[in-house]
Amino acid sequence: MEKVKQTIRAPRGTELQTKGWVQEAALRMLMNNLDPEVAEKPEELVVYGGIGRAARNWESYNAIVDSLKTLESDETLLVQSGKPVAIFKSHEDAPRVLLANSNLVPKWANWDHFRELEKKGLMMYGQMTAGSWIYIGTQGILQGTYETFGEAARQHFGGSLKGTLTLTAGLGGMGGAQPLAVTMNGGVVIAIDVDKRSIDRRIEKRYCDMYTESLEEALTVANEYKEKKEPISIGLLGNAAEILPELVKRNITPDLVTDQTSAHDPLNGYIPVGYTLEEAAKLREEDPERYVQLSKESMTKHVEAMLTMQAKGAITFDYGNNIRQVAFDEGLKNAFDFPGFVPAFIRPLFCEGKGPFRWVALSGDPEDIYKTDEVILREFADNEHLCNWIRMARQQVEFQGLPSRICWLGYGERAKFGRIINEMVANGELSAPIVIGRDHLDCGSVASPNRETEAMKDGSDAVADWPILNALINSVNGASWVSVHHGGGVGMGYSLHAGMVIVADGTEAAAKRIERVLTSDPGMGVVRHVDAGYDLAVETAKEKGVNIPMMK
């Protein structure tokens, strides 16, 4: 992959570089994904998650930018694994962009085949929001992480993480949310990463409080704050596959254990035990097969230590990076003895059509986001948990790139919020249009048996029709851009998922599109969980009037 040193930053204000606000939104969000404040390795087009890219290569990136600048408001641009391949006449209510990233026929859906194609320049890894142009930095996963640790606190620690120690690893674009999510819930956390740059970045953005290279110092500080029942987050430089076994040897058991290293990609994501970053990069280049094997062996040790901690009383869960699957394939037969975070903590929210709803101010003006915060506090005042989140986010979350906000809203709530935002753009309360989107990790848009659809009540974990239906209904309902990806979060062969983005530009046409899309999108989550037999989803569907032909 050619590295290009150039600083990409989305335009701000109301001057258009394109032929309409929807095209402008796509252009600005693509560029925002590659803003140095947002992307992990912008010079390689890598946004987050190992090698999750915004475009296949620099030639494709430039062609996408040129295409968006000339795209008419009744045309649709097609993007295949980060490369623009066609512009067709469509209509004004159709998506302006349709994206398909990293999709492989199931028999060939593995890292080896993907890498062959990538080497030939035929494919890229889109992760979830990297290739679909709606990544907003670490805030994008923060509330989900906050909700996860909050639910763990409610289930196991009396509603707060005060006086508890969480141990985790991985401080990249996704995992970097963990330290702040734990301290927001009142806890102490030691978060391990092999890359000092990742820890430094989280400290700079106020997601993590302190840095140390000493396990002794990390434990001393953690114990001191745990006894005081005060929150603190400690970024510890090191390899989790070495540090966790060392803690086991010392008979030190945290209260909560999880992991968000990039274990989904054994070649580009995980660093084997005994290697510096530089040595790992050299081995990756010279002997990728040996690198992958060493990574898998390290992951197995990592999971073994997590299992031992679980046996000693730690609340242990997988945070969706497929590390259990790797360890299982390496012969660790009890790797799945600790649950994934979705069945353990998040599924009830999915049954209500709730998920990580986000919006971005295309103006670049933080005031536009603060005004939308007030809408949440006013319109959803009865939801104290949600309002607390907004208040904390305002104080503690630093914007990366274009100002943005995330919060988990459910069926009915998303459409209501979208309507209000569009009206605020129309009457000039907001200085420019707002982009509304979400993660692919949502209630009705993903099939991922080791993560979002793990342990479904009816055994339908691997059924992948749902994300396809989600993309189809969002497209016909007029989403601004729609994406279908493979392998996000957990790696090749383990997930299919869909994304959508809708632009609130203040027009009446946008109001109608918003109403349709922000109803059908979370509606798919309710439908999917009704179909799987969840009573809470059935109650939600009946209460909200979701039309499900065979619902009992």
From Swiss-Prot:
Pfam families tied to this protein: Urocanase, Urocanase_C, Urocanase_N
Catalytic activity line of the entry: 4-imidazolone-5-propanoate = trans-urocanate + H2O
Annotated residues for binding of NAD(+): 49-50, 127, 173-175, 193, 239-240, 260-264, 270-271, 319, 489
Gene3D superfamilies assigned to the protein according to its UniProt record, in alphabetical order: Urocanase like domains (3.40.50.10730), Urocanase superfamily (3.40.1770.10)
Primary enzyme class: lyase
Location(s), subcellular: Cytoplasm
Pathway: Amino-acid degradation; L-histidine degradation into L-glutamate; N-formimidoyl-L-glutamate from L-histidine: step 2/3
Listed GO MF terms: urocanate hydratase activity
SUPFAM superfamilies: Urocanase (SSF111326)
Domain of life assignment: Bacteria
Alphabetically ordered keywords of this record: Cytoplasm, Histidine metabolism, Lyase, NAD
Name of the protein in its database record: Urocanate hydratase
Lineage, broadest ranks: Bacteria, Bacillati, Bacillota, Bacilli, Bacillales
Gene: hutU
